[in-house]
């Protein structure tokens, strides 16, 4: 009996005790660690994780590590080290850890967001990027799609003149429809079941993936009932059922001479692959239905809550800083006027608006901690060795709030992104990576920048958004899920008199 206990103890010690490198190998400083549980007892139990990691930096330095179960995780909180990881050694650290929750969400590592580095991931990512080329010109031009949805949004908000509303649902619908037009050339209306379904699974994933999941540290816990896993499984099934129906419909009407959206591109790639190698089984080939559905699901996950959240953060900070909102509206009035709507090319003239968006992305990054990277091989960051299969976190919050890089980093100061004359956009620090960088950078960065700029410009051209009478300013604390969400808030919507007059003159 005692021999068995001793043997079990030795096995656990071997599996969970921190590894020691060869003589002379220098590893990042580590939090204390215990067998089995690792550093779990020594991590802060309350507060936002990105803030806690930033505080730990002051004790352990800009790169340090901790252990959870048998896994070592390195945290990076300085832009030079982050750029080395993401860009200079991007391929070496392009892997993704396959945790229990991620495996369930991504159908065991398919798609592009959570897939490990592989030929399949590279191909799907390349196709998603190339799909944007379908929307460069003509009626399908990306900007036209965005403006079409913005026209519907503003028409609706005009009917709410003088009312107090939470804008989140309206902005969500606008962004969803832009994504749906890119993915499968469909736009939904308020109340459509598909729109309700999309909201249900995107919100469900954001909430369930952000819990502290012990099952990701100790995978054997999945044999027990787990609320988080049940939620992910439920929303994965809901998403799969909807997207499978759409994929089936798109396959039936697919024409190789009329590829017009992302799902067409993926179907075309599947047809080409089947023609070239029909012996592959359904699940192993690069474009199985499962691969296509997971990639489409990733586009919704990466593209909807992110852009929607940033727009709401911009509005919230402008409510807190009405003098900035006034400057932006004066800028729009002078450079755009009321005879037309803002275009993306106006970004060169609407500098205070562009600076404000950049400042919001700094002070409240979409993802305060980037999705974890994994070392594909033994490597190094700075002067420190990083073993193969080590997880690496980039703490964007630390980069964007470093007092040595930013003047008063906790203060909202859009002017920091303008030159002293206010006539040119500048990047005041290299410690700024709102969309990540390198092989794992956000595939939808260009789309997100257009969406955020145009949505904000259109809203501020046409409406005054103010704190409701007797109401409170929005909380700027935030809710750190997989996306940094803002607490719900309401605004009073007033159609701007100058816009109303211009519309009346135009219809006369």
Swiss-Prot record:
The keyword Transmembrane helix does not apply. GO terms for molecular function: heme binding; iron ion binding; lyase activity; steroid 17-alpha-monooxygenase activity. Pfam families: p450. Its cofactor is heme. It is found in: Endoplasmic reticulum membrane; Microsome membrane. Its EC number is 1.14.14.19, 1.14.14.32. PROSITE patterns: CYTOCHROME_P450 (PS00086). Pathway: Steroid hormone biosynthesis; Steroid biosynthesis; glucocorticoid biosynthesis. It catalyses: a C21-steroid + reduced [NADPH--hemoprotein reductase] + O2 = a 17alpha-hydroxy-C21-steroid + oxidized [NADPH--hemoprotein reductase] + H2O + H(+); progesterone + reduced [NADPH--hemoprotein reductase] + O2 = 17alpha-hydroxyprogesterone + oxidized [NADPH--hemoprotein reductase] + H2O + H(+); pregnenolone + reduced [NADPH--hemoprotein reductase] + O2 = 17alpha-hydroxypregnenolone + oxidized [NADPH--hemoprotein reductase] + H2O + H(+); 17alpha-hydroxyprogesterone + reduced [NADPH--hemoprotein reductase] + O2 = androst-4-ene-3,17-dione + acetate + oxidized [NADPH--hemoprotein reductase] + H2O + 2 H(+). GO terms for cellular component: endoplasmic reticulum membrane. Transmembrane segments: none annotated. Keywords: Endoplasmic reticulum, Heme, Iron, Lipid metabolism, Lyase, Membrane, Metal-binding, Microsome, Monooxygenase, Oxidoreductase, Steroidogenesis. It is an enzyme of class 1 (oxidoreductase). Regulated predominantly by intracellular cAMP levels. The 17,20-lyase activity is stimulated by cytochrome b5, which acts as an allosteric effector increasing the Vmax of the lyase activity. Heme binds at residue 442. GO terms for biological process: glucocorticoid biosynthetic process; hormone biosynthetic process; progesterone metabolic process; steroid metabolic process. Belongs to the cytochrome P450 family. A cytochrome P450 monooxygenase involved in corticoid and androgen biosynthesis. Catalyzes 17-alpha hydroxylation of C21 steroids, which is common for both pathways. A second oxidative step, required only for androgen synthesis, involves an acyl-carbon cleavage. The 17-alpha hydroxy intermediates, as part of adrenal glucocorticoids biosynthesis pathway, are precursors of cortisol. This is Steroid 17-alpha-hydroxylase/17,20 lyase. The lineage of its organism: Eukaryota, Metazoa, Chordata, Craniata, Vertebrata.
């Amino acid at each position: 009996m005692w021999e068995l206990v001793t043997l079990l103890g030795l096995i656990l010690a071997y599996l969970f005790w921190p590894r020691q490198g060869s003589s002379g190998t220098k590893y990042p400083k580590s939090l204390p660690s215990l067998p089995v549980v690792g550093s779990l007892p020594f991590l802060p139990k309350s507060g936002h994780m990105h803030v806690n990691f930033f505080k730990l930096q002051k004790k352990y330095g800009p790169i340090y590590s901790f252990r959870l179960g048998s896994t070592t995780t390195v945290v990076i909180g300085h832009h030079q080290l982050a750029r080395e990881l993401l860009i200079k050694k991007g391929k070496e650290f392009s892997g993704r850890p396959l945790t229990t929750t991620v495996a369930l969400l991504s159908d065991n590592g398919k798609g592009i967001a959570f897939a490990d580095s592989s030929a399949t991931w590279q191909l799907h990512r390349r196709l998603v990027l190339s799909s944007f080329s379908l929307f460069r010109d003509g009626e399908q031009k990306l900007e036209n799609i965005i403006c079409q949805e913005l026209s519907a949004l503003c028409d609706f908000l005009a009917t709410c003149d003088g009312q107090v509303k939470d804008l989140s649902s309206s902005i969500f619908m606008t962004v969803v429809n832009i994504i749906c037009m890119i993915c499968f050339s469909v736009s939904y209306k308020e109340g459509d079941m598909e729109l309700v379904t999309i909201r249900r699974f995107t919100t469900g994933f954001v909430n369930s993936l952000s819990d502290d999941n012990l099952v990701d540290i100790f995978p054997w816990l999945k044999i027990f009932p787990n609320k988080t896993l049940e939620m992910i499984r439920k929303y994965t099934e809901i998403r799969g059922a909807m997207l499978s129906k759409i994929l089936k419909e798109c396959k039936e009407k697919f024409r190789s001479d009329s590829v017009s959206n992302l799902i067409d591109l993926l179907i075309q790639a599947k047809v080409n692959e089947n023609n070239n190698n029909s012996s592959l089984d359904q699940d192993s080939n690069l474009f199985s239905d499962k691969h296509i559905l997971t990639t489409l699901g990733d586009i919704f996950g990466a593209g909807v809550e992110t852009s929607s959240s940033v727009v709401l953060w911009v509005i919230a900070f402008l409510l807190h800083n009405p003098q900035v909102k006034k400057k932006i509206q004066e800028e729009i009035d002078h450079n755009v006027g009321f005879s037309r709507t803002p275009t993306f090319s106006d970004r060169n003239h609407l500098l205070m608006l562009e600076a404000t968006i950049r400042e919001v992305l700094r002070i409240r990054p979409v993802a305060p901690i980037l999705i974890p990277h994994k070392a594909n091989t033994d490597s190094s960051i700075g002067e420190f060795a990083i073993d193969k299969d080590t997880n690496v976190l980039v703490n964007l919050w630390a980069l964007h709030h470093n007092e040595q890089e930013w003047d008063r980093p906790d203060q909202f100061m859009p002017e920091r992104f303008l030159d002293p004359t206010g006539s040119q956009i500048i990047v005041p620090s290299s410690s700024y990576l709102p969309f990540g960088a390198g092989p794992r950078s956000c595939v939808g960065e260009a789309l997100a920048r257009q969406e955020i700029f145009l949505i904000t410009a259109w809203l501020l051209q046409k409406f005054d958004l103010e704190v409701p009478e007797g109401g409170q300013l929005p909380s700027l604390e935030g809710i750190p899920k997989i996306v940094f969400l803002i607490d719900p808030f309401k605004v009073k919507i007033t159609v701007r008199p100058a816009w109303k007059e211009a519309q009346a003159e135009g219809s006369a």
